[in-house]
């Protein structure tokens, strides 16, 4: 346990490896690993790593397709988890690997209890940093040949769909501009997300996010700087500051043919899916906005002012969600319904536990007193609501500077409460 998560590690198992997007040609050899769950739902594993043969199966995971482009130098992993992505970078021959993890429990497990089993902390070419990835990379001037962000989120609240209403500062245009600026010449930023050919959902928004980020970096034709590869329900997007070369494109085609991945997009090969084609054809922010304006889902690129990457439901398309479509729409609809129910419950509880006792204590006898009581209650309720709205927005922004939500919460609460107290004291005098 720590202040914001619960991580459970299970006993060692000897089973076929867990791959996010496994190739059909992957060998079925068993490996030793410890399964892990975070907050009771999100899953990962700590793999045994004593020799390259122990992690050879990682070559068959689509989240690692970017490594086949033979970039060397230092790799950066956003979200260490059980160490799988660090092991992947080492397997594909990177000189050094930096792993950035916001949850200290993972780093502690890899550096102590599972130090020998995972085989990472005892290597000179592996460095761990406990920090928010965006905050760290904003302050660092280090350059990387590959930056990998594979399925970084938590499933803790997806049962009710509530996670679609959570903020995520890693999936905004400003964050991706930071990540892209930390790439060395020819470097690759690789992002893996969930995908479905019928309901493209997150993949469409990731593409939109990549296009807008490149446009803000003065790239004239973003489609030439991106490739999208899929297998099953996982997609991997590759983004470069420089256009992908003909050698890169040929290499991707060879790898995808050998591993039976599907190529959705490479330069000079736009997708057949209309919305993806329109997004990748955009050569300005206005064209991108026009391309996604009439889609049933919200594919607009999230920004720091609207960092809700996972909330893709448009209120003017509620009828589409109500028709019972699966995937993103149904999850977003559950989230909206859950939010409305919670607001109603909280409203009733607030009136029952605060409003009614105050009413009974004062018992206004005239219409004027009754109006004054309820207007006063409404006035102070609005002040409290405004206080919370400001707090939520500032915590999100402060995370980038402090590197951790716990620090942001502590600093912000102290500052707001102290300032409010001083303001009340001064106004009374």
Listing of model-derived features with the role each one plays in the protein:
Residues 263-337:
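Periplasmic/ER-lumenal interhelical loops and adjacent helix-loop junctions
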Residues 204-218:
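Short alpha-helix
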Residues 105-106, 113, 123-124, 129-131, ...:
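Mobile active-site "lid"/loop adjacent to the S-adenosyl-L-methionine
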Residues 192, 215-232, 265:
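Conserved S-adenosyl-L-methionine
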Residues 345-356, 412-429:
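Transmembrane alpha-helices of Major Facilitator/SLC transporters
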Residues 1-124, 306-409:
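Class I S-adenosylmethionine
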Residues 222, 234-290:
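Flexible, glycine-/basic-rich loop-and-beta segments that form/coincide
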């Amino acid at each position: 346990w720590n202040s914001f998560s619960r991580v459970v590690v299970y006993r060692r198992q000897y089973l076929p490896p867990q791959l996010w997007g496994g190739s059909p040609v992957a060998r079925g050899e068993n490996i030793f690993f410890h399964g892990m769950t975070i907050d009771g739902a999100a899953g990962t594993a700590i793999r045994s790593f004593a020799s390259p043969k122990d992690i050879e199966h990682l070559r068959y995971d689509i989240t690692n397709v970017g490594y086949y482009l033979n970039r060397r130098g230092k790799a950066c992993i956003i979200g260490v988890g059980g160490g799988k992505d660090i092991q992947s970078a080492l397997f594909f021959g990177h000189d050094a690997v930096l792993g950035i993890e916001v949850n200290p429990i993972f780093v502690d497990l890899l550096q102590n209890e599972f130090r020998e089993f995972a085989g990472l902390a005892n290597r000179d070419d592996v460095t761990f940093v406990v920090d928010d990835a965006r905050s760290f990379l904003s302050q660092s001037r280090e350059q990387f040949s590959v930056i990998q962000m594979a399925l970084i989120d938590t499933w803790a609240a997806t049962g009710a769909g509530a996670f679609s209403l959570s903020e995520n500062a890693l999936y905004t245009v400003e964050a991706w501009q930071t990540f892209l600026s930390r790439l060395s010449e020819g470097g690759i930023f690789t992002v893996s997300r969930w995908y479905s050919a019928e309901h493209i959902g997150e993949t469409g928004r990731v593409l939109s996010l990549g296009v807008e980020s490149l446009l803000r970096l003065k790239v004239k034709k973003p489609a030439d700087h991106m490739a999208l590869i899929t297998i099953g329900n996982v997609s991997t997007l590759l983004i470069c500051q420089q256009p992908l070369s003909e050698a890169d494109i040929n290499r991707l085609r060879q790898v995808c043919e050998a591993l039976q991945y599907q190529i959705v997009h490479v330069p000079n090969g736009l997708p057949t899916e209309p919305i993806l084609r329109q997004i990748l054809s955009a050569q300005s922010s206005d064209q991108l906005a026009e391309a996604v304006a009439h889609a049933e889902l919200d594919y607009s690129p999230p920004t720091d002012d609207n960092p809700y990457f996972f909330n893709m439901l448009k209120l003017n398309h509620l009828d589409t969600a109500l028709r019972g479509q699966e995937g993103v729409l149904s999850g977003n609809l559950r989230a909206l319904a859950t939010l409305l129910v919670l607001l109603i419950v909280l409203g009733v509880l607030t009136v029952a536990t605060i409003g009614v006792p105050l009413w009974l204590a004062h018992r206004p006898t005239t219409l004027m007193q009754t109006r004054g009581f309820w207007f006063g209650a409404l006035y102070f309720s609005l002040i409290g609501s405004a206080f919370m709205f400001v707090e939520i927005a500032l915590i999100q922004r402060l995370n980038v500077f402090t590197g951790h939500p716990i620090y942001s919460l502590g600093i912000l609460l102290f500052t707001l409460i102290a300032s409010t107290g001083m303001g009340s004291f001064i106004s009374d005098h």
